[in-house]
A protein has these predicted regions:
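Residues that recognize and position ribonucleotide moieties
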Residues: 28, 57, 92
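Core catalytic loop region at the nicotinamide-binding pocket of NAD(P)H-dependent oxidoreductases
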Residues: 15-18, 42-53, 76, 126-131
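C-terminal "lid/loop" region of Rossmann-like NAD(P)-dependent oxidoreductases
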Residues: 20-22, 50-51, 60-66, 73-91, ...
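Amphipathic terminal alpha-helices
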Residues: 111-131
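Residues within well-ordered alpha-helical secondary structure of globular protein domains
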Residues: 12, 41, 70, 105, ...
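Conserved C-terminal active-site "lid" loop/helix of NAD(P)H-dependent oxidoreductases
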Residues: 32, 62, 84-106, 110-113, ...
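NAD(P)-dependent short-chain dehydrogenase/reductase
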Residues: 1-36, 40-43, 66-71
Length: 131
């Protein structure tokens, strides 16, 4: 995952590497705990259908790097590289209104809370030899 990759770069003492303009590249990041709750609620919907699961709040890749550095107690800056992809999608945001109405789904884990809860696993995975 992006969070693990950036976390491992930081734990290696390196500035996290992101595309130039990463403060403007937005994604609708969601915590797995919220995804599980949405799936449980989808077992008994008010109406059958296809449901979007997300937070409806897009956040930047830069925000992930900044939160990780704050949680890991570092200030390594950010290493920016040119984005090599033409037509790179700059913004995703889930419309969860139908999920809210028909499933009673509401995301509860913020990006900050999710990353904070993940720090011990990032450190554990970083120290694990998988070769």
């Amino acid at each position: 995952s992006m969070v693990i990759q950036l976390g491992h770069q930081i734990l290696d003492g390196k500035a996290p590497t992101l595309f130039e303009g990463s403060d403007q590249i937005l994604r609708d990041f969601i915590n797995i705990e919220d995804v599980v709750q949405a799936n449980i609620k989808a077992c008994n919907p008010k109406e059958n259908g296809t449901y979007n699961v997300g937070t409806s709040t897009p956040r930047s890749f830069q925000a992930i790097a900044d939160i990780l550095q704050a949680e890991l107690g570092t200030d390594l800056g950010t290493n920016y590289i040119k984005n090599p992809y033409d037509g790179y999608q700059m913004h995703t945001q889930a419309d969860i209104s139908t999920s809210q109405t028909n499933l009673g789904f509401e995301p509860v884990v913020s990006l900050e809370e999710g990353i904070k809860a993940y720090i011990s696993d990032i450190k554990r995975l970083h120290s694990t030899d998988i070769s």
